[in-house]
């Protein structure tokens, strides 16, 4: 019997409660054994002052999932030289773990962009895409996507960074403490 592992990719700048809820709901609704959080590189053209470094983002993720045995972090995309595509990452993971079915979890806001993903026609044969239903987003694409439901949330990392003074309710307590301690996103 194959293992069932969820992958939740993102910049996680910062990781917040909606990321945690997405992972929890996917694990519960799909019967996944574990969830791998896959932090992405921030493209050089997006790396502006006020954004957290790779190490800071990984540290915040570790704080967020601390004590949850079925949640882990995979940093391979941060370590890869050059461009990092989901296709390459999943090809490597499947090669390393041929006894595993991977479920790639994406927010409802990302589903409509799937046709633009690198090697998407091959990628949809390699993994099961899981779209987190959000009423405000179009989730119809020409690919089979497993849909899971999650209560509507308006939390986004961008909004948190832009309004850091009022962000504590959207962040795990340890992540909020880390942001204050390290004065990230302008938090003094």
UniProtKB/Swiss-Prot annotation:
Record bears the keyword Cell membrane: no
EC number(s) for this protein? Answer: 2.7.7.18
Question: What keywords is this UniProt entry annotated with?
Answer: ATP-binding, NAD, Nucleotide-binding, Nucleotidyltransferase, Pyridine nucleotide biosynthesis, Transferase
Q: Which InterPro entries match?
A: Cyt_trans-like (IPR004821), NadD/NMNAT (IPR005248), Rossmann-like_a/b/a_fold (IPR014729)
What's an example of a GO molecular-function annotation for this chain? ATP binding
Keyword Transmembrane helix set for record: no
Query: Which GO BP terms apply?
Result: NAD biosynthetic process
Coiled-coil boundaries: none
Give the metabolic or biological pathway: Cofactor biosynthesis; NAD(+) biosynthesis; deamido-NAD(+) from nicotinate D-ribonucleotide: step 1/1
Functionally, this protein is described as follows: Catalyzes the reversible adenylation of nicotinate mononucleotide (NaMN) to nicotinic acid adenine dinucleotide (NaAD).
Q: Which PANTHER family match?
A: NICOTINATE-NUCLEOTIDE ADENYLYLTRANSFERASE-RELATED, PHOSPHOPANTETHEINE ADENYLYLTRANSFERASE
Q: Which family does it belong to?
A: Belongs to the NadD family.
The name of this protein is: Probable nicotinate-nucleotide adenylyltransferase
Protein source organism: Listeria monocytogenes serotype 4b (strain F2365)
């Amino acid at each position: 019997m194959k293992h069932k592992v969820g992958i939740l990719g993102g910049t996680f700048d910062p990781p917040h409660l909606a990321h945690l809820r997405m992972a929890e709901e996917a694990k519960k609704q799909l019967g996944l054994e574990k969830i791998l959080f896959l932090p992405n590189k921030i493209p050089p053209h997006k790396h502006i002052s006020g954004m957290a470094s790779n190490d800071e983002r990984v540290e915040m993720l570790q704080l967020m999932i601390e004590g949850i045995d079925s949640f882990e972090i995979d940093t391979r995309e941060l370590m890869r030289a050059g461009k990092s595509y989901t296709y390459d990452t999943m090809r490597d993971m499947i090669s390393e773990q041929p006894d595993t079915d991977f479920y790639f979890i994406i927010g409802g806001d990302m589903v409509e962009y799937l046709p633009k993903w690198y090697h998407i026609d091959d990628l949809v044969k390699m993994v099961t895409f899981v779209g987190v239903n959000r009423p405000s987003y179009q989730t119809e694409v020409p690919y089979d996507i497993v849909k899971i439901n999650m209560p509507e949330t308006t939390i986004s990392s961008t909004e948190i960074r832009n309004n850091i003074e009022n962000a504590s309710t959207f962040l795990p307590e340890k992540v909020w403490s880390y942001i204050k301690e390290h004065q990230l996103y302008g938090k003094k």
